[in-house]
């Protein structure tokens, strides 16, 4: 069994003293959203880096249910933080550039006022008398903390899981105070499935004889069994099916010997028992109940319309990240957030990161090369502007390719076809070269859609808004006539349902610009006729016949006929010989290797 068998996102976390924690007592009482008042609120927080003279480089990190203020090490002598892979010098959230704040949330058990705090009215811990709190109450406390620190506006708010709920709340409750929002592996409301796991966990705690109505802070028994079971249930939801197979599949009947009284016949049982026992040493059962209930009550709307109405209040740029194997906060739930932001014309980027790690992916190093780079790139452009290096090589990216050559000559013509100061949606935007050109020209509302992760990262590095989506699944997130122009550049030949995709782009755009390789180009005909072989050359046709992404081999004449059959108006056609660098006016179907159409319906 591997040495890391017992390791997880919890590894290294403990109840040790937080040596760098700071404490502030908030001014005035805290009126709670669901009624009641906390008259004395203390917040424990940690900071990293330096606040600059303009006080505009502050990044607030919101932790998840079982987190605390110790997001990262302060020095080599310090204990590990729960997000060292993301926060620190040179890390995606670079503490050499940003002033990072991470407070323990309201209701927590690591110093901020919670159920284990002393109620000034009784002199005893609040325990079950601690009032019901909400994500909004947590964010209100964080807002007052930023007031105390003299920060009017946060460069960004970042958080995963329940931390993502806090990010969503910040963006809608205090829109003028947030420059960028990065909700990770989260949702606008819990699914019934996720809610069910929390209900079982809370029941396990309150039915433990050691719970004693919540007043277990004396020398008597504590609800350790119930809290451990709640945590075991949680850990099941944090792992994906594949992660469990990799961790336990080959050693199912070889459990690790751990000093717990839970079932240990199977390796997964010894793992869960160990995790439950670890958690009991550092967390409070009443806090678990209070915080999980706040998470379960969080709800930005049970319909796309309600969610869009709620998110409409935000003024920030957005980066939404999900993970393909997360079944607790599924990618579909992140996509609901993204779709609501798209519906209200917000600046949003989205990536569903390929991962086998499940919900815990955002806390593990396995995929940080991608989600971490998205965070780094987004933060560097969160206040607007694009990266204008001009050289793709500077970023370690391939230059954009044309049908046959290393330069996208069709982009020059496409840019000329787009009227100034118009909105543009670029489908299959690649690394964002066309969008960057348009942004430089002064277009303020330009959005890309792309499927490839690395291309999305490249776009975010440029400061562009790009949403990960598969064109073959439609453009339902976009409204009728939402954009002045929709561009489908050198993508149509890889589309499965051409009629549906073309119909969709004509619905979303007032004008659509479609470019594609002309498979009737005379050089391709020659290869087929004289050599009897499938045409193969550089650019888009560099693939072998058996591994080509191109599935539609059509010509300029074919597309013109298609437009006629579909009742599509062709406003302009440009035919190019990209090898010669010239426009073709005679027998374009034979002499052009690339065509550009401007169409509408």
Segment roles from a protein language model:
Residues 485-496:
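A short SAM/SAH-binding and catalytic strip from SAM-dependent methyltransferases
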Residues 500-504, 511-601:
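S-adenosyl-L-methionine-dependent methyltransferase catalytic module, highlighting the catalytic core
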Residues 46, 50-119:
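N-terminal cap/lid subdomain of alpha/beta-hydrolase-fold enzymes
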Residues 320-322:
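Short beta-strand/loop motif that positions the catalytic acidic residue
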Residues 433, 437-474:
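Class I SAM-dependent methyltransferase SAM/SAH-binding core
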Residues 183-278:
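Alpha/beta-hydrolase-fold enzymes
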Residues 405-421:
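Conserved alpha-helix/loop element of class I SAM-dependent methyltransferases that forms part
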Residues 351-391:
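Catalytic active-site module of serine/aspartate enzymes centered on a nucleophile-bearing elbow/loop
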